[in-house]
C-alpha cells in the first residue's frame, strides 16, 4: 500500500498491508441507484437542504448571499491558465445530484455516478443498501488488483481523465468532457470499473498526509482528532481515492490506486462519488436488471 515516486509526502511510505475479506461494488453508485433510495425513503441530501448560517462561524452579514442558498461545488473552466483550484470551482446554488451543473443545466443521467453528496448522504444510502463505505486500505487493495504501481497517465481506453492542458484544453481522447457513465472503460483485474478516474471515491478514513508505517492490519487511518489536511487545516477531512476526470499530467497526477487527498465531508462536488463495500455477498445486479426482474414478477 502506498507509493513514493509521485507525491511521497501524501502517499508514502510503501508498506505491506493486510485487510480482511470483503466485497465491493463493481462500479460507482449511480444516479439511478441513488434515485431509487431517495424516492423510496423521501431522502433529501445536504446540497438540497436549507443552509445553516452558523456553520460559517461568521455573522450572517459577512456571508456571501449565494452561500446561504442550497447548492454545491461545480467545476467551471477558467478563461486563463491557472494553478489555483479556487479559479475553477464555483459554488452553484441549486446544484445537486439531480442537477449536477446547476438548475439551468441538464438533469442527472441514470447511469452516471451520483455526485454532490456529503458524507451523511453516503452513509444513509449505504445503510439502506446493506453496505458501508470502504476503508482506504480496502479501496486501494481492490483498485490495485495485484499490479505494480505506475506513475503515468492511463490511456483513453482504461480511464476517464483529462487529456490536454488542464484546466483550459481538454482533447477528450477518451470520448468524454466530464463524467462518464459507469462501465465505459476496461475493468481492472478484479473486474471493477472506474477505480481510476471518472470521479474521486470517498473512503471511511480521516485524512493526514502520508501513512502510519505501523498500520499494517486493517488500517483505519487517524482518529478524527488526529486528522489534518493542509488545504483545510481546521477541518477533519475524509480520504478520497483514484482521481477524477479532472486529473491531468500538468496538474493532478492522482490517477493511480495509491493516490489520495482529503475532502470536506459536508460539501459535495461535481467530481466526487463513492461505491460500497460489504462484509457478506450482496446483490450485484445492475439497477436495470433488478427493475426488469421486479416488473416480471
Feature annotation, model-predicted:
Residues 16-21:
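A short N-terminal beta-strand-loop micro-motif at the entrance of redox/enzyme domains
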Residues 8-12:
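C-terminal, low-complexity/hydrophilic appendages and adjacent surface loops
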Residues 22, 37-46, 129-130, 281-282:
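Short capping motifs at secondary-structure boundaries
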Residues 30:
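Acidic-aromatic/histidine active-site loop/patch
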Residues 25:
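An anion-binding catalytic pocket shared by soluble metabolic enzymes
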Residues 270-284:
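Short, structured beta-strand segments at or near domain termini in extracellular proteins/domains
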Residues 2-6, 50, 54-257, 261, ...:
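Functional-site microenvironments in short loops/helix caps that host divalent-cation chemistry
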Amino acid at each position: 500500500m502506498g507509493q513514493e515516486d509521485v507525491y511521497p509526502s501524501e502517499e508514502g511510505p510503501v508498506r505491506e498491508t493486510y485487510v480482511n475479506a470483503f466485497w465491493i461494488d463493481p462500479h460507482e453508485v449511480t444516479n439511478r441507484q441513488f434515485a431509487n433510495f431517495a424516492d423510496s425513503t423521501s431522502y433529501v441530501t445536504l446540497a438540497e437542504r436549507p443552509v445553516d448560517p452558523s456553520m460559517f462561524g461568521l455573522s450572517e452579514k459577512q456571508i456571501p448571499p449565494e452561500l446561504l442558498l442550497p447548492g454545491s461545488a461545480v467545476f467551471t473552466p477558467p478563461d486563463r491558465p491557472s494553478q489555483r483550484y479556487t479559479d475553477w470551482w464555483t459554488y452553484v446554488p441549486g446544484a445537486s445530484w439531480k442537477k449536477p451543473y446547476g438548475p439551468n443545466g441538464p438533469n442527472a443521467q441514470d447511469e452516471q455516478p451520483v455526485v454532490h453528496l456529503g458524507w451523511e448522504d453516503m452513509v444513509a444510502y449505504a445503510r439502506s443498501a446493506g453496505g458501508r463505505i470502504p476503508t482506504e486500505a480496502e479501496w486501494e487493495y481492490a483498485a490495485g488488483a495485484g499490479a505494480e504501481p505506475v506513475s503515468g497517465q492511463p490511456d483513453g481506453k482504461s480511464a476517464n481523465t483529462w487529456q490536454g492542458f488542464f484546466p483550459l484544453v481538454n482533447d477528450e481522447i477518451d470520448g468524454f468532457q466530464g463524467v462518464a457513465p459507469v462501465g465505459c472503460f476496461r475493468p481492472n483485474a478484479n473486474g471493477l470499473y472506474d477505480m481510476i478516474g471518472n470521479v474521486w471515491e470517498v473512503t471511511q478514513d480521516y485524512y493526514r498526509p502520508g501513512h502510519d508505517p505501523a498500520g499494517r492490519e486493517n488500517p483505519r487511518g487517524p482518529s478524527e482528532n488526529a486528522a489534518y489536511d493542509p488545504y483545510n487545516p481546521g477541518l477533519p477531512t475524509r480520504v478520497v481515492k483514484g482521481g477524477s476526470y479532472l486529473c491531468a499530467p500538468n496538474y493532478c497526477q492522482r490517477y493511480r490506486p495509491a493516490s489520495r487527498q482529503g475532502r470536506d465531508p459536508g460539501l459535495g462536488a461535481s467530481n466526487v462519488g463513492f461505491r460500497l463495500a460489504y462484509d457478506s455477498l450482496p446483490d450485484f445486479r445492475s439497477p436495470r436488471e433488478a427493475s426488469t426482474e421486479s416488473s416480471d414478477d
